[in-house]
Amino acid sequence: MARVAARLGLPETRAPRDPSQWGETVLSARDVVLLYDHVLSGMPTEDRELIIGALAAAPPIATDGFGQAFGLLAGAPPAASKQGWMCCQAGQITLHSAGIPDPGRRFVVALLSSQPRGVGYDGARDTVTDVADAVRAPLA
């Protein structure tokens, strides 16, 4: 991870202390946007289309049973987005939605949230979706 982060200029991305806990990778919204920028403008077309196609085809329910139709994936038009979730470090729910919100691929949005465990996953999803809707509206 350190090699790729250095190559792509992602100064705030760090591997987790325990490599088996990939969900504890530290990153910033800025680094997420820089990574998407690399995918959109720095990769061969075939590789870019493979990644964006997979993101755009994300199912509403993830393999682990978690509902991921929130944030950028909850709105219209359909987005190409990577969702992230984890509970409950320091009493917080971590819920992220980052990707390309428009079919023209003109914009990249990174929504990274850490919310009190008490709001529950439904409340956390609603918050991230509300923010995604607010961000997406002026981009249309």
What are these regions (language model features)?
Residues 1-140:
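Penicillin-recognizing serine hydrolase domain
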